[in-house]
């Protein structure tokens, strides 16, 4: 009798687990598919355009009163620019008026100079931006409103030095220093320096994490963007987060993707199956806080179906040949999908623009070929 009760109870538990599991999956809704671009502009689309036009890849030093201040650094030197939301939106507005060949329209925008001389900041000091110069011996001279400071760079004499201002705050600055040798070798340093020029610290790139964890850079932490309002987490370079409470550098898994702003994680967003294809089905996004705590709280959950997307596009195909996340930021995800032809070749390609601004449980996915691979 006891044995029968035990078997019955076990069967009931298994049944409840199955029902509960199915229920959770059933609660996750598939995205709403729409062909073409969004009908109107939005803050999240604007940030996506900044990325596509190469503006977000430059160091964004500030965004205030609808105005961006950015730094661009290359072999020609270091320059500062300012542009407004309105100027940016006017620049990419042809995308919304184009009736066809959107990929060509985007390409034309990408190959047209947006950062012209009119947007160049001439008086750096007045804009609270440092002037940085190198003498013939590659000694760095930094000039701010507080004065000037000369800093000798290690093993830089006779080599090509590239400077990049990564961040500027009220109290601190962060300068990237790349020293290129004549034989093709290079060494990257990070120069942390006080705005009043009272002190500085130079750290090798490969020693940045250990130096952070040692506490030696405690006075300079403001140069790293806050991931959370309380500053419990700070965004470092690449897929790394600094946790202030534990004084530890945390790494986002290689199979997951950190958003451009460093605040969200796309679970398994970089976990590609065979032939460079990420999985469709349930997609999950967490805040960095929840991700690092290891819980199951999700900021967004929704379903994607690659077959349904091909049907919407009218592709005759046995399935996807490649599928990857091209762009991920707060409230916006952009995928690049390519489909096999029935026998050989390609049936077609499409970009999927998932807009999470209004609905994170059933977002709208815009299907459009922007030529983004």
Each model region followed by its residue ranges:
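N-terminal "mature head" segments of proteins
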Residues: 11, 15-153, 158
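Repetitive beta-architecture junctions, highlighting loop-to-beta-strand starts
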Residues: 78, 86, 135-140, 186-190, ...
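Recurrent small/Gly-Pro-centered beta-turn motifs in extracellular repeat architectures
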Residues: 124, 129-133, 175-179, 268-269, ...
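Bacterial N-terminal signal peptides that target proteins for export
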Residues: 2-9
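Short coil turn/linker residues within repeat-based beta-strand modules
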Residues: 139, 144-149, 196-199, 246, ...
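Acidic, serine/threonine- and glycine-rich low-complexity intrinsically disordered segments
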Residues: 158-320
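Hydrophilic extracytoplasmic domains
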Residues: 24-28, 40-60, 269-373
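Structural signature of eukaryotic scaffold interfaces centered on beta-propeller domains
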Residues: 43, 51-54, 60-62, 110-126, ...
